Amino acid sequence: MKYYCETKSATDLTRKTLALVLAGGEGSRLKDLTKWRAKPAVPFGGKYRIIDFVLSNCVNSGIRKIGVLTQYKSHSLIRHVQRAWSFMRYEVGEFVELLPAQQRVDKGWYKGTADALYQNLDIMRRHTPDYVLVLGGDHIYSMDYSKMLYEHAESGADVTIGCIEVPRMEATGFGVMSVDECFKITKFTEKPANPDAMPHKPDKALASMGIYVFSTEFLFQKLIEDADNPNSSRDFGKDIIPSIIEDWQVRAFPFEDETGLPVYWRDVGTIESYWKASLDLCSITPDLNLYDEDWPIWTYQAQMPPAKFIFDDEGRRGEAIDSLVAGGCIISGARIKRSVISSGGHVHSFCLVKDSVLLPRVKVERNCRIQNAVIDKGCVIPEGTVIGEDLEADRKRFYVEEASGIVLVTPDMLGQRLHITR
């Protein structure tokens, strides 16, 4: 495995690029999963946090000047970044720098995505980048940003926006764009009620990935203009991008493979989308390859022993099928099917866990049945508990997402107070 991947075709560009990761969002659609943590800090894939994917993309793309802007309930996110990303060496121009909301400009906190950057203008200027790469910290994907940087520089664009095809009726939660034959953006609407369809693809819309490459001075100019506009909501998608479409070079960069097909990218903003993206990893050949040694996903994990599967009696056999089981787990006479069991989990005898996601340090006592569920970090599931079979009963105890029927269980719902405030 490489320490990092340095792209050969764009190293000058990547060295002159500052990446800023917007990681301050509340993630309210994830309900109680973000009650005590920011969305980018939510565990994912057995041993990672959501933010690890965008940070790994930066490092693997050769971009090693990175700022992480935090605000909402940021303690676990800050702690994770400090532990996982301290291998960057500032002496040779590498860093992952935490930029919490700290009222640098006035008495207000970050009011929106554009305001978060505006309040850190002095820090951006200090690093003297030629380009600023703005990223969301809450999506799951692998992407070589150097290709997008190269296209931006070659085209002479003022800003380039990463985009991907999505089902048209799912595009209401994204910025939706229209482009000409040269991928110049001709229209941009943030979260439209009736998204525009793509030409010749009536069931698809071209959605923003929340990835922007700005030429630095252009970005500074537009941030200042936006800050001076009393009618602005201080947001890139709602304010800055629509205002520059007509008079400036705003281009789209489709996120696709060598054959022109869309590549794996997931917005895990709801319980169902988080659950689906997690179980995607359990397929035989996942679209997101966690095992690619040329594109490793970096993270922090406490030193843990290997996963252990014990007992081989009929009806009490420790086994996992089509599942991910992370380090430190013990599957003790239990059956796991198409599920993710995260670090330090312990599933006791005579249990069945299927189509579920267990976050780190979950303990499932004997004779439990769990299906179609997300179990939050640190939960202890009492003996004999049944989750996911009777949604009416589950609604009385837990959160059930109405559209999907996925059940979310947290320690607070079980009466287990892990966060004592008084």
UniProtKB/Swiss-Prot annotation:
Gene3D superfamilies: Hexapeptide repeat proteins (2.160.10.10), Spore Coat Polysaccharide Biosynthesis Protein SpsA, Chain A (3.90.550.10)
Family matches, as CDD domains: ADP_Glucose_PP, LbH_G1P_AT_C
Covalent S-S links between cysteines: none
Family annotation (PROSITE patterns): ADP_GLC_PYROPHOSPH_1 (PS00808), ADP_GLC_PYROPHOSPH_2 (PS00809), ADP_GLC_PYROPHOSPH_3 (PS00810)
Pathway assigned to this chain's UniProt record: Glycan biosynthesis; glycogen biosynthesis
Repressor as UniProt keyword: no
Catalytic activity, reaction form: alpha-D-glucose 1-phosphate + ATP + H(+) = ADP-alpha-D-glucose + diphosphate
SUPFAM superfamilies found in the cross-reference section: Nucleotide-diphospho-sugar transferases, Trimeric LpxA-like enzymes
The keyword Nucleotidyltransferase is assigned to this record: yes
Chain sites annotated for binding alpha-D-glucose 1-phosphate: 110, 175, 190-191, 208
Entry's transmembrane regions: none
A Pfam family the protein falls into: Hexapep_GlmU
Entry EC number(s): 2.7.7.27
A GO term, aspect molecular function: ATP binding
Keywords on record: ATP-binding, Carbohydrate metabolism, Glycogen biosynthesis, Glycogen metabolism, Nucleotide-binding, Nucleotidyltransferase, Transferase
One of the GO biological process terms: glycogen biosynthetic process
InterPro entries with a match to the protein in the record: ADP-Glc_PPase, ADP_Glu_pyroP_CS, GlgC_bac, GlmU/GlgC-like_hexapep, NTP_transferase_dom, Nucleotide-diphossugar_trans, Trimer_LpxA-like_sf
First-tier enzyme category under EC: transferase
Summary of the function given for this chain in its UniProt record: Involved in the biosynthesis of ADP-glucose, a building block required for the elongation reactions to produce glycogen. Catalyzes the reaction between ATP and alpha-D-glucose 1-phosphate (G1P) to produce pyrophosphate and ADP-Glc.
HAMAP family: GlgC
Subunit structure: Homotetramer.
Family assignment from sequence similarity: Belongs to the bacterial/plant glucose-1-phosphate adenylyltransferase family.
Designated name of the protein: Glucose-1-phosphate adenylyltransferase
Gene that this sequence comes from: glgC
